[in-house]
Amino acid sequence: TSIANPNEDAHFVRPKPSFARDLRRAEVFVTTGLDLELWVPALLDRAGNSDVLEGGQGYITAYTGVELLDVPVAADRSRGDVHIFGNPHLTTDPLRTIQVARNITVGLKRVAPDRATHFDAGLAAFTDRVHRRLFGDRLIDLLGGQTLERLALQGRLYEFFGTQEFDGKPLIEELGGWLGTAEPFRGQQLIC
């Protein structure tokens, strides 16, 4: 069951009694955390299910371990609506989505340890799919997804490409996937 549907703004979900009923029976509750879903604590309290309350074995926080972006130095209304803990829109970045998937996997294994192998296999398949779509098959086969992910998260991916060659050509020529498609726009100012 999903409380916040993909076509809804998670900031403004209107809790309904049926949500509390669903949470009363739930084994797992996944929250983005931070200050995205300010309606969550009241809903969890109303449900009265200790397994999905913060600290319960079925409570999963998506943002754990994700480097937060846009953390304000000071929160005030002069900049409009500001997320005081940083940008909670984690799944707009494929690499941050992988960390969210890792967090969900940890939580699922906590609730159903007998299915850990299944959850790990799903995470591995998802991670490989994202890596291949982001970097392209060739670079994944050459360097491995974890290496490329680490370099990208450290902001060193293009620096690395600038110092490496493969078959006498700059390594960046092997870049495929979404980043390869977007390469002509790198360094350009875009207005969307």
Could you say what each language-model-derived stretch is?
Residues 1-192:
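Extracytoplasmic metal-acquisition and chelation regions
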